[in-house]
C-alpha cells in the first residue's frame, strides 16, 4: 500500500468488502430484458466508503479489508490501492449489483458475505490492532456486514477488537445491521453506533413516529454503554444522542440521484469534524470529549452531498450544502418517514 504516513487519526475495517457493479438504465422493467446505458465498477463496503470520503477531505484513514485472492488486480483496477490495506484470504470477492434508474430509483442486490476461517479472522484482528498502534489512531471504524466462520456459520466475533481498542484508549464506531447490530448494540461495546431509523426501531422493538421516539430509542443504547448514537432519518435528517444531550440536524432538500452510500458519508463527515476540530481547553466537551454537534452538522452535509452523486462512494466534499443544527429538538415533531422496525 502506498500513500500512508504514520499518524492517521482514523483506521477503518470493512469485514466483508464487495465489488460494487452499477448498471445505469433509463427505466427498469421487471421480468423483461433491460439494456444498461453504462456500467461502473468500484471496490466498496461501508468502511471503504468511509475511508474514501475521509481521504477526499485530506484526513488519512487507512482501510483494512480481507479480500479474496482470486482477483489480485482489483485494488489497482478500482483505484483503491492508495488508502486500503488488503489482507488476502482464500476465495472470491463478493459482488453487489446496483441498478440505478434515470429518475433516481435504486435497486440493489447484495451477495452474502464470504465466510472466513478462524485463522483468517484472527489475522484480520491482528492486522487491525497492528495498524491502529502503528498509526497512533484515535478512532477505529468497523463498518458493514459481518462474515460468518466457515466451520460454525456463526458471525465472527468483534469482542477481541473491542477489548484491544479499549485497552489502547481508542474510540470505536460501529455501523452494521441485522442480528450483529442487535447483539453489539446490547453489549454497548462501541463508542458510537450509527443505525438508521428502521434499524433502531427493530432494535428496540417498537415503531418510531416522532423525533422523541427516536431519541428515547437511542437512549436505550446509551443505557447499554454506547456513548453516542447517530440515527439517520432519511428526509428527516439525523439526530445525535448521548445520555445527557440530544441534537438534530438537516440540510435544505437536495436532488437525490443515488441513496447508496449516504449513510457511510454521514459517518465519514462526523469523524472528519471531530478529529479536525478537537476540543480545546475550556471548551464544552459535551460529556464525551469530542464535538458531537459539529460532527452531526457535518454528517448531514456530507450525507446530502452523497445522495447527489451517482456512485456509492463520495467523489467530492467541496461545495457542501448548508447544515442546520437544532440544539433543542422538538420531541413531538412527526417524522416524514416513520420507522416500523420490520426486518428487511
Give the residues covered by each predicted segment.
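Conserved phosphate-binding/catalytic loop of the ribokinase/pfkB sugar-kinase fold
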Residues: 88, 98-136
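Hydrophobic anchor at the start of a short beta-strand
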Residues: 10, 60-62, 83-85, 172, ...
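Positively charged, low-complexity intrinsically disordered leader regions
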Residues: 1-29
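Conserved phosphate-binding/catalytic region of the ribokinase-like
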Residues: 211-344
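Short beta-strand scaffold segments in enzyme catalytic cores
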Residues: 52, 95-99, 237-241
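Short acidic, glycine-rich surface-loop motifs adjacent to enzyme active sites
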Residues: 131-151
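Substrate-binding N-lobe of the ribokinase-like
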Residues: 35-94
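Conserved phosphate/ATP/ADP-binding segment of small-molecule kinases
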Residues: 155-244
Amino acid at each position: 500500500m502506498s500513500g500512508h504516513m504514520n499518524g492517521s487519526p482514523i483506521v477503518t475495517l470493512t469485514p466483508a468488502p464487495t465489488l460494487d457493479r452499477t448498471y445505469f438504465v433509463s427505466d427498469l422493467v421487471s421480468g423483461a430484458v433491460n439494456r444498461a446505458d453504462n456500467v461502473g465498477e468500484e471496490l466498496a463496503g461501508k468502511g471503504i466508503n468511509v475511508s474514501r470520503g475521509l481521504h477526499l477531505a485530506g484526513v488519512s484513514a487507512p482501510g483494512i479489508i480481507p479480500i479474496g485472492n482470486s482477483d489480485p488486480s482489483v485494488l489497482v483496477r478500482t483505484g483503491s490501492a492508495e488508502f486500503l490495506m488488503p489482507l488476502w484470504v482464500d476465495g472470491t470477492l463478493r459482488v453487489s449489483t446496483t441498478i440505478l434508474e434515470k429518475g433516481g430509483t435504486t435497486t440493489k442486490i447484495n451477495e452474502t458475505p464470504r465466510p472466513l476461517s478462524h485463522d483468517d479472522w484472527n489475522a484480520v484482528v491482528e492486522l487491525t490492532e497492528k495498524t491502529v498502534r502503528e498509526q497512533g489512531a484515535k478512532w477505529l471504524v468497523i463498518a458493514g456486514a459481518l462474515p460468518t466462520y466457515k466451520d460454525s456459520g456463526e458471525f465472527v466475533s468483534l469482542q477481541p477488537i473491542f477489548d484491544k481498542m479499549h485497552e489502547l484508549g481508542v474510540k470505536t464506531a460501529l455501523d452494521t445491521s441485522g442480528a450483529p447490530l442487535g447483539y453489539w448494540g446490547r453489549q454497548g461495546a462501541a463508542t458510537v453506533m450509527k443505525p438508521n431509523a428502521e434499524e433502531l426501531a427493530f432494535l428496540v422493538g417498537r415503531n418510531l413516529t416522532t423525533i422523541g421516539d427516536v431519541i428515547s430509542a437511542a437512549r436505550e443504547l446509551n443505557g447499554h454503554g454506547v456513548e453516542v448514537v447517530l440515527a439517520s432519518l432519511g428526509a428527516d435528517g439525523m439526530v445525535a444522542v448521548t445520555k445527557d444531550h440530544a441534537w438534530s440536524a438537516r440540510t435544505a432538500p437536495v436532488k437525490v440521484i443515488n441513496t447508496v452510500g449516504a449513510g457511510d458519508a454521514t459517518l465519514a463527515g462526523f469523524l472528519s469534524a471531530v478529529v479536525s476540530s478537537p476540543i480545546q481547553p475550556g471548551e464544552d466537551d459535551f460529556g464525551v470529549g469530542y464535538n458531537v454537534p459539529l460532527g452531526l452538522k457535518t454528517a448531514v452535509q456530507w450525507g446530502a452531498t452523497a445522495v447527489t452523486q451517482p456512485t456509492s462512494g463520495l467523489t467530492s466534499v467541496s461545495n457542501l450544502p448548508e447544515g442546520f443544527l437544532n440544539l433543542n429538538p422538538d420531541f413531538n415533531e412527526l417524522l416524514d418517514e416513520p420507522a416500523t422496525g420490520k426486518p428487511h
